[in-house]
Amino acid sequence: MKIRIATRRSPLAMLQTHEVIERIKLFSPKSICEIVQMESEGDLTDAPLHTIGGKGLFVSKLETAIANGVADIAVHSLKDVPAFIDSQFSIAATLPREDEGDAILLKEGLTIDDLSKNLRIATSGPRRKSQLLAMNSKLNIVPVRGNIQTRINKMNVDSLDGLIVAKAALNRLNIQHQNMYTFSEDQMLPAAAQGAIGIEINAIELESDIGNLLKLLNDESTYQATAIERTVVASLEGNCLSPISALCKIEAQDAELKVRVSNQNGSKVYNEAVKFNLDNKIDALQRFIETLIQNGAKEIIQQ
């Protein structure tokens, strides 16, 4: 069986794609995988994402490749995939989740306690920015774009004191930094689906040979947890650029979901959490989302 896999050209995207291929080979050793490298609209510009359509730009070109028959599946950093996707497509599988947390790379000589000072910290995401400003409103948040290594290089060029990155990206790329600190969930709750690799397919192919193969390699715990997180974002009418954090952890049939929403400048932060059994997932999640909305979560993220 031949499987054409659409992916972005970045080092991280390619590494994630090879991780998918390894898992495909584990369940279907005779499958032939062809990588279809693409440059998304988001890769072709350094403009801030919120001015050019958001992180969905990283996804749309790969979806077009599937729709046009150029590729059979697409590999994504699942946190970059909009909570609402066209019904023509489906997230068919996820790989086991990497570390879902956020990390800060600090200039030599600084410690995490120095975040109480007026430092120059680089991050491009409203979620991270708002949580940083909630810690210290005097921080100077500097927007940054590019792949992980490009961003790290900018620390020296732009005289930055720190850079926020996903711990999963550092782990997958095996990037070591001499002065790194991983945020606790209380300090910075991650984005929905952060650390997870998602595999997208044309919805009509879910029961095809490729679709059935993806069911075999799917990590069910990651799939369920990220689906719950993405449901929260969708229910709050958020997107990849909304200051919404959601993290679901599953052990056996027990789930714990934490959500944090904030306004853009971090002056207003609302936290909510719930524990439930997966057998009662639909009702528990519906009640939880109703609580979020009743307590003004939608209004907060729009401020």
Over which residues does each language-model region extend?
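Small-molecule-sensing regulatory modules
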Residues: 1-39, 45-47, 51, 134-303
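A conserved helix-loop-strand patch within extracytoplasmic ligand-binding domains
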Residues: 78-79, 87-138, 205
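Short, well-ordered beta-strand segments
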Residues: 4-6, 74, 92, 122, ...
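N-terminal winged-helix
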Residues: 11-25, 54-58, 83, 103, ...
